[in-house]
Amino acid sequence: MNRRQFLSLAGASASWVFLSGHSPYRQWMVYRETHLVILTSRDDLGADDLGEKFAAIVREALPDSGAAVGRGPRVQRIASLISTGQAMVGVVSRPNALAMYRGEGPFQQYGSIALRILVQNEAYQLVCREDFLPQHGYLLTEALMEHMSMADGAGLDLSVPGRDAADAGEIPPHVGALAFAEGRSLDTKGGQ
């Protein structure tokens, strides 16, 4: 082995040792396990603004949630992260949410995504994965809906879809959000 080959091999080995333990994916996994990441996209400023409001409300009502906004470059990134279980919650326009749910249009490559609605207004929906814990859905919906009744939350005009949403061709509500909307109790202390 000549000097050039040795130095190349040594450099490659050193790079591998230093870089192999610093995958941002692992840091993302830890971050999302300790924070509620509300996804938004830079290509929809309305959803981004609403996501910021939601995160601020949730941080105030549920400080342990560590609620934060995670911005993707396009709404397709939200579909990618939610469909693969790398994220649980996102703010999406109603047409985009329905297209994600059905696996249509720009979301065909992700297939039909099992989404549920936590809260919605006229233009946007706070969507989550179907397997988002019922307790978390209940607490999140409770925080947002109760804030809406305050003076500074009046402009949010939020609602929870009814049980018949799926029959009407819409995305069904999350089980925890529906329990809150119907005034049913849910064990919010159990689970994770």
Residue ranges and their predicted role:
Residues T40, L118-H136:
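A bilobed periplasmic-binding-protein/Venus flytrap-type ligand-binding module shared by bacterial periplasmic
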Residues D152-Q192:
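An extracytoplasmic/periplasmic, membrane-proximal ligand-sensing/linker region
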Residues Q5-Y25:
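N-terminal export signals
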Residues P63-S80:
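Short helix-initiation/N-cap motifs at beta->coil->alpha
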